From Swiss-Prot:
Disulfide bonds join C8-C38, C16-C35, C24-C56. It is found in: Secreted. GO terms for cellular component: extracellular region. GO terms for molecular function: serine-type endopeptidase inhibitor activity. The record marks L18, E19 as: Reactive bond 3. It comes from Oreortyx pictus. SUPFAM superfamilies: Kazal-type serine protease inhibitors. It comes from the Eukaryota. Keywords: Disulfide bond, Glycoprotein, Protease inhibitor, Repeat, Secreted, Serine protease inhibitor. Residues 6-56 form the Kazal-like domain. Glycans are attached at N45. Avian ovomucoid consists of three homologous, tandem Kazal family inhibitory domains. This is Ovomucoid.
Length: 56
């Protein structure tokens, strides 16, 4: 079982695109795209992780 991860090193960004490529966070919330997810990861001080790609 490989852990899924996303490289958030270039975040946070001030604005995200409207691109829809959903990711499911460890908080059971669906994030619209990597940018939204990574901004949330930064805000959570790294406690939020990627559960899987796609909707929760």
């Amino acid at each position: 079982f490989a852990a899924v991860s996303v490289d958030c090193s270039e975040y946070p960004k001030p604005a995200c695109t409207l691109e829809y490529r959903p990711l499911c966070g460890s908080d059971s919330k669906t994030y619209a795209n990597k940018c939204n997810f990574c901004n949330a990861v930064v805000e959570s001080n790294g406690t939020l992780t990627l559960s899987h790609f796609g909707k929760c």
